[in-house]
A protein has these predicted regions:
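Zymogen propeptides/activation segments of proteases
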Residues: 1-170, 177-327
Length: 327
């Protein structure tokens, strides 16, 4: 059952709520069934007593109105189907309906922002990405998702498993929005681009673990990746790989592959310090970054941020980056 992220540090800008149905974070991770496939968006879940457990009833929060998917932190627009509207019983849809993906995008971006706020950002620490982000469900069959800093919006693709059916794809893209809010234009070098991809993967794992923990947390996008991977478990990428800097950089450079160096360092920080302290340090450090920062320089700034939390934290963060060749 997804955990409702709340607490005294969460800033609630608007009060409207509504019932909804989502995957948490996705059927493969949730049910532990690696043989699930897309089947052209068919809803084969509802009629099966085991598979129907992949659907979770949740409460959408921070809505401007309980009638539509627009709120304090996200506004959803569909370009390939009718816009989701409250049916009277809430936003209860199944995966064969385009509206299900819209609900997923709204819920998981809101949960990501609420998690960040629960760490103190916006209260005891500067706010991070506390703005309304637009989300477009379109791409007309393209299996790709991306964040555009020029428009401050996220586009989620519909090729293969529709990207918005996997919470970790949604939150990964939100990670780019987070970094753009902290450092305008972030990601203008190969290293900075890799940091962006690595952080997106890590944030996806961090948020999904906070809301709906699963056994294999280090596997990113278990459901979306069933359309383009043959190995089991199915993962877009993992955050517990073995790559080091600079010997394992891709040639030519490829930010997603190189991002696995950064995400592993963040994962090790999490294992050493625990989720909440690690995530606070990781996110807070990004205020010190520059648009074209190198991985070693970003590691140095993260270590400096960790020092604010005491010598044990600084030592653990230094060790995590040293293991990746970054300190």
């Amino acid at each position: 059952m997804p955990q409702h992220l709340s607490g005294p540090r969460v800033v609630v800008a608007v009060a409207a709520t509504a019932p909804a149905q989502v995957f948490a974070p996705n059927p493969v991770a949730d049910l532990g069934i690696q043989t699930l496939t897309d089947q052209k968006d068919a809803d084969f879940f509802s009629a099966d007593p085991v598979l129907r457990r992949a659907y979770h009833r949740v409460t959408l929060t921070d809505l401007t109105s309980p009638a539509a998917l627009s709120g304090a932190f996200v506004a959803v627009k569909s370009e390939t189907g009718p816009a989701a509207a409250n049916t009277g019983s809430g936003f209860i849809f199944t995966r064969d309906q385009d509206q299900f993906e819209q609900v997923m995008a709204y819920y998981w971006i809101t949960q990501a922002q609420r998690y960040i706020q629960s760490l103190g950002f916006g209260s005891t620490l500067p706010a991070v990405n506390r703005r309304q982000v637009g989300v477009r469900i379109n791409q007309f069959g393209g299996d790709n998702s991306f964040f555009r800093d020029t428009k401050t919006d996220i586009t989620l693709g519909k090729g293969g498993v529709d990207d918005a059916e996997d919470a970790e794809v949604i939150v990964h893209e939100y990670g780019h929005s987070v970094q753009d809010a902290q450092v305008s234009g972030f990601g203008t070098s190969a290293d900075a681009g890799a940091i962006g991809e690595g952080f997106g993967d890590y944030l996806a794992v961090a948020v999904s673990s906070a809301v709906a923990p699963t056994p294999d947390e280090a596997c990113v996008a278990d459901w979306d990746s069933t359309s383009y991977t043959v190995t089991v478990p199915h993962c877009l990428r993992r955050v517990d790989g073995t790559k080091r800097y600079p010997e394992d950089l891709a040639s030519p450079r490829e930010v997603h592959a190189d991002g696995e160096i950064w995400s592993r360092a963040l994962w090790d920080i999490r294992q050493a310090l625990g989720a909440r302290l690690a995530d606070t340090i990781i996110i807070r450090a990004q205020f010190r970054f520059t648009p074209a920062i190198s991985m070693p320089a970003a590691a140095k700034q993260t270590i400096a941020t960790a020092a604010l939390y005491g010598k044990p934290a600084q030592k653990a963060v230094t060790a995590a980056f040293a293991a990746r060749g970054l300190a």
